[in-house]
């Protein structure tokens, strides 16, 4: 039977969140999977963090499309901020301004697949896999199992090798088996408090006695895991920066100064790779609620926990405890995920040196299963597929229309005008 032309009918996706590929490679079952299948590492977009990367790997879309940028936000940036609380208070928010897009399970169900999606603890993994793989079916079926694991779990148990053996047996030679990860812990060299540095620059002004921020005289501040906000007059509760010319001047100064001036006091090394203007990263209808600037740290440097909530302390740099790791706010390459898969539609023994976007995982899996997709931020990774399959199943290169419609453009312009940007 020609599986490539008939189509795959069984798929199992083992989603291991928080795991490093290097820890998995030591397992013979993973080595066998890499020899028979394909592997690519997947980089997230700034701003990094578990929630943002969850959305990217499961939807194929950047969360900015539905108004999500970070899990920590200034209260004044929420659609309906609470009254009686300082608008600059940092609050937790895991949802966007709009509903998230359809996720992989929904996309498969819409295409006629039967989907079972479990999110479990590592202790439940083996029992869950046993239950899922004991059931045979004649329908197109995809089973997705997600759990969070770490290096210690791999070292002290045989759960993952056992789970992989069961999965390979269930999908057989004609199905798809994928091992997927959305994020891994990043080692920390130094924690950095950007707000301390902004205070030293005079961008943030503090009261000499209380040391509280004097907002009417503060030009910008850092929050969350990469957000740099201009304290804009007419938009923020106690805005200080006038729109247009003064706004542009403050942005230009921070974009140029932070990467060159903020340096590790011990080595003199730069700690910020780049400061992006929001227009460089985002272009959708929620541009109006994106951070004015986005900070990307160099590998090894992360925002201090205090700075993510607008805290100001004596030390700009703090040393982590031995072996300490973190995820949110790290350089994208340090918290990358990966896709490891084997299927009749995929190549054999292909491990890509170049990383792909984290958003390419969903279109790659869908294309391997011969499921049509639209409105993705990345196409499927062509180098992972067999030439024979690509010949009869070319990859969509128009993953989504990048241009806004006239109606969307008018909506964005109206919002920006209301906020004083134009």
Task: Explain the meaning of each model-derived region.
Residues 18-21, 47-48, 62-64, 121, ...:
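Short, solvent-exposed loop/turn segments at secondary-structure junctions
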Residues 228, 295, 338-342, 365-369, ...:
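A short aromatic-rich beta-strand->coil structural motif
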Residues 40-61, 119, 148, 187, ...:
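Short, solvent-exposed turn/loop segments enriched in Gly/Ser/Thr/Pro and often Arg
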Residues 301-362, 367-370:
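Low-complexity, glycine/alanine/valine/leucine- and proline-rich hydrophobic stretches
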Residues 123-163, 225, 233-237, 241-242:
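Active-site His/acidic residue clusters
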Residues 7-9, 25-27, 31, 36-55, ...:
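Secreted, luminal/periplasmic, and some membrane-associated catalytic domains
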Residues 10-17:
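Short, hydrophobic/glycine-enriched beta-strand segments
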Residues 9, 355, 366, 378-422:
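Long, internal low-complexity/basic segments
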